[in-house]
Structures are given as C-alpha cells and as structure tokens.
C-alpha cells in the first residue's frame, strides 16, 4: 500500500521529507501547503540545497503545481489548517512540519480538510509519540501522532538495545547538535533563551533539550532514568549523541558492541547502524539511519559504566523516519 501524503510547511524538514519520498516505495507526496512562499520559490528551494546539494530529479512548475520527474504535486498557500483542501488532492496522511501546529488540538484541524491521519514532525506536548524500531507497534489508531525529535530518534533505538540486553540504571546524554533555523546568524535578541540568541556560526552554545527525557515516553521503563542537554555547534548538518550510562548487568565494551551489531543486523536493521571507521560529521551527511554508533569513539570505565557515541543526520535520517512512520500507520489501517 502506498500512502498518499500531504506536507504542511515546506521548511527544512518539509523539503527533505519531499526529497526522501522519491526513494521511499511506500509513500507518495501528492500535495504541499505553505502560506509563506509562492510555488515558484518552493520549486527553487526544492531544486537547490546548500547542505544536500541539487535535487537529482528535474524540477519545474506547471500552473499551481510543482512537477518533479514528470510527476505533478499540487501546491497551496492556505494559512488556516482547517481550510487546506487535502481531500481534493487525495492526500490522506498529512506531515505537519511547520513547527507551529504541534498539539493534538491544533494538528487535528487538518482532519477537517479530509485528512485521515496527521504525523507531527516534531515533539508534541500531548500527541502520542512514536520512534520507529522502538515503540511504533504500540500505535492504537490515534488520528494525530508525533514522530518525536531527531535526537530522540537517535538515542531511543540505542538505549533500547542497551536496556534490553544489560539494563539501563540511569543515563546522561549530551547531544552535540548542528545549528538550526531557530538560531541567529549574528547576535540578536532571544528573550527566552539568552544564549540561543548568540551567533550560531561563531559559538558553541549550551542548550536544553527534552530529547533524552522523551526516551521515557517511548520506553516507559526508563521514565525518569535518562536526561540530558545539548550543545549547538557551528556546523550546518549532522549531529552526534554522547550517552553515558550505568548498566545493571556488567559487560565488557566488546560485549556491548556485539549486542549493538546484532541489533543493527537484525530487528533494528535500517534504523540502527554502526561504523568502525575514523569518521567525522560530514561523512554522515545523507545517512538514512536514525543512529550510527561510532565504535571507536566509545569508552568503558568498568563493566557497569560506559560512554557510547552515535551519529545522526538530523535532517535526512529524521525525515526518512517521518515517512517510515507514515507508511506504518497507513499499513496498520486503524
């Protein structure tokens, strides 16, 4: 079954989801809505990307549609989500990627336009949260769901393996995260987060994140046992999680890596991966996995206390999971 997808919000994630959909056999984007840009500009931003390069397919416009590789995708510019005519374009599964409509109440407005389900491409305060490979099988038919954050998608599969094999007593995470659109190019006012107002390309910026705590939402046994913070760094893409944790069942670093390899080649194939190469962040650009464990970067102090390092392309890999979750929900048919 191919899920007919609509995208609301054609920013970083919206466009990367769109690009990903052309190599995702179970999803098809049939409509895009963004009230802040015209169709000509949408096509331009889709075609050219400073981080991921030029789109491999031909892109042009035909009236109010974007045409990619001969395929027409309707483009609308409606501000009110309740008035977006998803049904007219056959869009049933809506990826809400504006960053604005992140609660069940706000995102549910899409249902009025004919949507069947809404997948929020961000954490949500009240929508059920799912991470592929971790808890998607608990999906029970909710009309609005969250795909969590890119960092939670990196951390949760890794933590799942550690917890199921060795038992995670507690953990602290630091996400070394590429800068994003919410940050400032030069020092500028940022009333709620003073540090966040400093120039993104000139500073290492400590920041709060709910990504680690969110692991407790997708792995309930770890509620209150994992937390963390982030440091925004002057790179445009690719981030890395540094997880330090205490294990209930002692194991050598080699035994832990063996468990990770088994999971990456087994039940978490396509989601969790690993590398034994001397990689740096740019080597991970375009990697479709949620979490790529850097075997050489991890260390163990003793059998019960260790640090695991795992990379993720916070744009490309995350967008892939958004489509995977969308396809899964469509296949379940609840």
From Swiss-Prot:
EC number(s) per entry: 1.2.1.12
Active site: 150
Domain of life: Eukaryota
GO terms for cellular component: cytosol
Positions with a binding annotation for D-glyceraldehyde 3-phosphate: 149-151, 180, 209-210, 232
InterPro entries (alphabetical): GlycerAld/Erythrose_P_DH, GlycerAld_3-P_DH_AS, GlycerAld_3-P_DH_cat, GlycerAld_3-P_DH_NAD(P)-bd, Glyceraldehyde-3-P_DH_1, NAD(P)-bd_dom_sf
Disruption phenotype: Does not affect the biosynthesis of heptelidic acid.
Catalytic activity entry: D-glyceraldehyde 3-phosphate + phosphate + NAD(+) = (2R)-3-phospho-glyceroyl phosphate + NADH + H(+)
Keywords tagged on the record: Glycolysis, NAD, Nucleotide-binding, Oxidoreductase
Cited Gene3D superfamilies: Dihydrodipicolinate Reductase, domain 2, NAD(P)-binding Rossmann-like Domain
Binding locations of NAD(+): 12-13, 34, 121, 314
Keyword NAD: yes
Residues the UniProt record annotates as site (Activates thiol group during catalysis): 177
Molecular function per GO: glyceraldehyde-3-phosphate dehydrogenase (NAD+) (phosphorylating) activity; NAD binding; NADP binding
Record has Nucleotide-binding as a keyword: yes
Record-level GO BP terms: glucose metabolic process; glycolytic process
Protein's pathway: Carbohydrate degradation; glycolysis; pyruvate from D-glyceraldehyde 3-phosphate: step 1/5
Family the UniProt entry places it in: Belongs to the glyceraldehyde-3-phosphate dehydrogenase family.
PANTHER family: GLYCERALDEHYDE 3-PHOSPHATE DEHYDROGENASE (PTHR10836), GLYCERALDEHYDE-3-PHOSPHATE DEHYDROGENASE-RELATED (PTHR10836:SF76)
The protein's assembly and partners: Homotetramer.
Function: Glyceraldehyde-3-phosphate dehydrogenase; part of the gene cluster that mediates the biosynthesis of heptelidic acid (HA), a sesquiterpene lactone that acts as an inhibitor of glyceraldehyde-3-phosphatedehydrogenase (GAPDH) and a growth inhibitor of the salt-tolerant lactic acid bacteria in soy sauce brewing. The GAPDPH hepG/gdpB shows much higher resistance to HA than the GAPDH gpdA located outside of the cluster, but it does not seem to act in self-resistance.
Name recorded for this polypeptide: Glyceraldehyde-3-phosphate dehydrogenase B
Organism: Aspergillus oryzae (strain ATCC 42149 / RIB 40) (Yellow koji mold)
